Swiss-Prot record:
It is found in: Cytoplasm. It comes from Streptococcus thermophilus (strain CNRZ 1066). InterPro entries: Acetyl_CoA_COase_a_su, ClpP/crotonase-like_dom_sf, COA_CT_C. This is Acetyl-coenzyme A carboxylase carboxyl transferase subunit alpha. Acetyl-CoA carboxylase is a heterohexamer composed of biotin carboxyl carrier protein (AccB), biotin carboxylase (AccC) and two subunits each of ACCase subunit alpha (AccA) and ACCase subunit beta (AccD). Its EC number is 2.1.3.15. One of its GO terms (molecular function) is acetyl-CoA carboxylase activity. Keywords: ATP-binding, Cytoplasm, Fatty acid biosynthesis, Fatty acid metabolism, Lipid biosynthesis, Lipid metabolism, Nucleotide-binding, Transferase. SUPFAM superfamilies: ClpP/crotonase. Component of the acetyl coenzyme A carboxylase (ACC) complex. First, biotin carboxylase catalyzes the carboxylation of biotin on its carrier protein (BCCP) and then the CO(2) group is transferred by the carboxyltransferase to acetyl-CoA to form malonyl-CoA. One of its GO terms (biological process) is fatty acid biosynthetic process. It is an enzyme of class 2 (transferase).
């Protein structure tokens, strides 16, 4: 098995820590909030408020399940438009009260069903991109599994984008890439090599800003490393004026 194939397998492993796991382990007194105030609550997106070293932080994440029933409840981590609208509601609330935002991303992509399209999936994703680009508080996005397509990007327009070591971030799945390009989904491993989707490759290209090591570390050590990194980064970002924060975020994405 190639290194890319191994990382792809680990990124999709059902035993990985979820967004809710990180929210509860990293932040004290985490309180989950629900609903988009428009249609319904989407179990694929979790969000709420917690404390980090005494500072209130808004946490948003895409949640996969840990077993079949959990995955059915979470729609296998594929958000509907109401999930993205819930995320935006919480982020705008964070802006109103001056709370930084941390997002945890693990999705193969936004849900492509008819109902999701009818309720404005494309609009919901596009609005998140627009609103996050101008959100007047610090944002840190962390890829914790799969970072698939616009469904992931809708929570990743951030001042800093990080990845865990054994995760992926891509425009679509390697299977989808192989099917479109070669009409043969079985060539997914070859596609993954071409796509440059691993954390190390993306760090080298400047797409992400930090890779958090996983191999050889216990779960508690990974959680502590993420917590420390968030604390340090928020301390730096909080020193910037709102104007400088937004300009740096804009220039970060203009580099692409």
């Amino acid at each position: 098995m190639s290194d890319v194939a191994r990382i792809l397998k680990e990124a999709r492993d059902q035993g990985r820590l979820t967004a809710l796991d990180f929210a509860k382990e990293i932040f004290d007194d985490f309180i989950e909030l629900h609903g988009d105030r428009n249609f319904r609550d989407d179990g694929a997106v979790i969000g709420g408020i917690g404390r980090l070293n005494g500072q209130a932080v808004t946490v948003v994440g895409i949640q996969k399940g840990k077993n079949l029933q959990d995955n059915l409840n979470r729609n296998f981590g594929q958000p509907h438009p109401e999930g993205y609208r819930k995320a935006l509601r919480l982020m705008k609330q964070a802006e109103k009260f001056g709370r930084p935002v941390v997002t945890f991303i693990n999705t193969a992509g936004a849900y492509p069903g008819v109902g999701a399209e009818e309720r404005g999936q494309g609009e919901a994703i596009a609005r998140n991109l627009m609103e996050m680009s101008d959100l007047k508080v610090p944002i840190i996005a962390i890829i914790i599994g799969e970072g698939g397509s616009g469904g992931a990007l809708a929570l990743a327009v951030a001042d800093k984008v990080w990845m865990l070591e054994n995760t992926i971030y891509s425009i679509l799945s390697p299977e989808g890439f192989a099917t479109i390009l070669w009409k043969d989904g079985s060539r997914s491993e070859e596609a993954a090599e071409l796509m440059k989707i691993t954390s190390g490759e993306l760090l080298n290209m400047g797409i992400v800003d930090k890779v958090i090591p996983e191999r050889g570390y216990f779960t508690s050590e990974i959680i502590e490393a993420i917590k420390t990194a968030i604390v340090d980064e928020l301390a730096e970002l909080s020193q910037l004026s709102t104007e400088d924060l937004l300009e740096a975020r804009y220039q970060r994405f203009r580099r692409y």
